[in-house]
Amino acid sequence: MTNKIKDILKTHKYLLLSFFLPVLLLEGIAIAEKIQPFGSESFLIVDALHQYLPFFADYQEKLKSMDSIFYSFHAGLGYNFLGLWAYYLASPLNLVIALVSKSMLTMILSHLYVLKIALCCFTAAFYFRKRRGKDEISIVAFGIAYGLCSYMVGYSWNIMWMEVMMMLPLILYGIDKLIKEHDGRLYCFALFISLWCNFYMSYMTCLFLILWYLLYSHKNVKEFFTNGFRFAGYSLLSGVMAAVVLLPAYLGIMQTSSAKLQFPKELWYGTFGNLFSRHFLGTTPLTMAVDDSKINLYCGILTLLMAGFYLAVREIRLIDKIRRLLLLVFLFFSFNMPVLGYVWHGFHDQYGIPNRFAFLYIFALLAMAYEGYCVLVRGKRKVSLWIYFAVILCGILIGITMKTSTVKLEMKTVYATVAAIAVYMICFALYQKKIFRKKIFTTLICFLFIVETAAMAVMGFQKNGTVDTDSYFQDTKAITEVKKEYQKNVETRMELISGRMLDESIWHTLNGMTLFGSTAQGNVVDMMDQLGFYTGVNEYLYEGATPFTNNLMSMKYQIYRPYDTKYTEFSLKESVGNVTVYKNPYRTALAYTMDDLVQTWDYEDYNPFYVQNDLATSAFDVDELFHMVKTAKPQLNDCKITSDNGDGEYVFENTSARPDNMVFTIRSTKTRQLYIHFDGSQVENTVIEKNGEQVLTGRLDSQIIYLGNVQKGDEIRIKMQLKQDNEMSGVVRLTAAELDEEVMEELAQRMQENAWKLTSAKGNHLSGTIHAQEDQMLFFSIPYDKGWTVKIDGKKVKTKALGKAFLTVKVPEGKHKVSLTYVSSGFKEGAILSVAGFVIIILIMLFSQRKKKAAVKEI
């Protein structure tokens, strides 16, 4: 056994080093940055904190409780968990979270980053070893250049992508085996794993694979077509094997806001220089950017030199150079052409993470550079003279970059790049002068290459920053106690009045309304906006509730922290640790019967108070719930109104940004519960004062705001600071309304009379009873989804969407048992396809094995 281990270490020492060296480096960075357990920091930055970590918490709870994988009520009033799992959580490596406590989750995920990046280095080194045919230091250097490139460092917080980057080298080596040995098994399994772990990034890989195959060096036309059938067949088979994930994921993503096709109109983003400068040594990795032309391209200066060397040497055929160059040029153009970028991103906008497919370009460039390196190593000493062509080419490209760049170049990156080229050139000169033997020369440049990329990785992670877990999760214990005490079933919804993270309520696995994620249903986002909640392209937050919408959504409890200053209509319940619990004064339910007139509900009005009035009237036959309060024109500073529709909508132009560009004043003529709502995309910040005292500040637009029980004579001032940008103009629409408390009491009573009584809630199955006074519509505060099956007294009934967003069914007069079961759309069909796919691949493997045995017998 010991001898076997020694043999493995001897035979694969550099391949193993390509894994363990990045692990040591990244763990060293973790220690320096005080990442848990070496401190309280975490690598979970940007959306890894606000989205992915909460989703992991929900997943962890499901794994530990063996709850249904299909559905979760811990976000968005309920959501297709399988669809979200396929997008964010499907990697088998993530199952490690089931072995640890929730308090260790941030630590485990930080070190899972380390593992996944190291595995990217390892698989790349494996690919380069297969190309070189030897286990040597160069595979470590080029493997690390892939795993620690600026793309990986900058976008490492997208932990769900890493398996796709990890599988790419294995997929490409699988294509080599498929074409040269007619064996597609490795290709099929590697692509299957990639598709399973993240279908979205794998889509980009699949586009790249088509280009890779078309530009591959085939022996002849016949081989091109015969291997093409194998390539297409195994590609399709890998998709069929992953269908149990792909089908639900695809059907889920098609319900999102971003599923709407809208091709960009621009022709170009920027210039060659803007892009190529991102190759320079010392460039700061990009973690996110609103500008879609931004990119991470750095993968080593030696890479550029060896790529130039590849183009220069005679030992490589001209046609092969043209093929490789065409691929790189096309990818490079794709970075700068909005239409091509739109296609690469699955016909979706890039939403702050530009050029996500750049890892494909980086690996293609590294593969080309490594071919050049192999020629250098195999060739005679005079072959290395072609490096001067590469240096001249790099010099020309640097010059063009400096000339054409329209963004400010950091000259230190230019100097660092030139200095790195000079250092490598000294090594080449010493080799050409026969001062260095080839072994010393290749070892030295590979060592320098490793130092270069490692230093950039250290700098990159320092620039990325970290997150202090103590400041974000200090209330977790108290909120967990609140949840245990009050969250009895899915009907008991509770929310944080404001979260430190956008999806913090999901982190605590509260039955909440908030959902910020790429799988948020577009129709639900639109409906929440119409009802007065804050929404974004792929989010709707618990910001903008009224007594009516709280009852409608069965919101029973609110959780406050000491810094929360928002008013609430709920009554104080108790304090637990550092948080305070408030309870809804009204009884609520998950579903209510509504009058059929609700089908005429006008939910598309821009005024959310009108939308709620019409819903309350049409569904429950009550009088007007909100009465509009007239507001005077705003006081203006460095701003002028160019148009006024007479109903609170103002078109403006501003000349500067001031805290009081626009000031609206409301003087209360009586005691009342007052609410406001305003839209203003050009509003930078808002301050709300009551009788001269500040009560709220921050991003307050696009949501209903409760201003409390305002007394007669009180003065409310809403100060808006406008943005100082290229536009310097926009629209502000402000509406004020008072709640009719008598109508609200009547409405709450009728809702309770029409309430569905929940009797059982297990995983993806709910059941309860309803007593309908007549044939009515049964409304569930659950997002409409075709995966729901509803039965009334055991008979399946047709489901409909109210306002395109909420689940409803027709219920006849009388008392009935109503049950709901959820299975993600596409799961059953996907499972059948996956089973069929695995049967086919097993048969292929058995046939291949039999064929090999037959060949051995003939010999």
Locate each region found by the language model.
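Active-site-proximal, structured, solvent-exposed surfaces of multi-pass membrane proteins
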Residues: 3, 8-9, 55, 633-859
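Hydrophobic alpha-helical membrane-insertion signals
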Residues: 7-79, 465-477, 481-506
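Membrane-embedded helix bundles of polyisoprenyl
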Residues: 22-26, 113, 117-131, 136-218, ...
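Active-site lumenal/periplasmic loops and adjacent helix-entry segments of GT-C-fold
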Residues: 29-132, 137-169, 193-197, 284-293
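Contiguous transmembrane helix-bundle modules in multi-pass membrane proteins
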Residues: 182, 201, 322-339, 348-475, ...
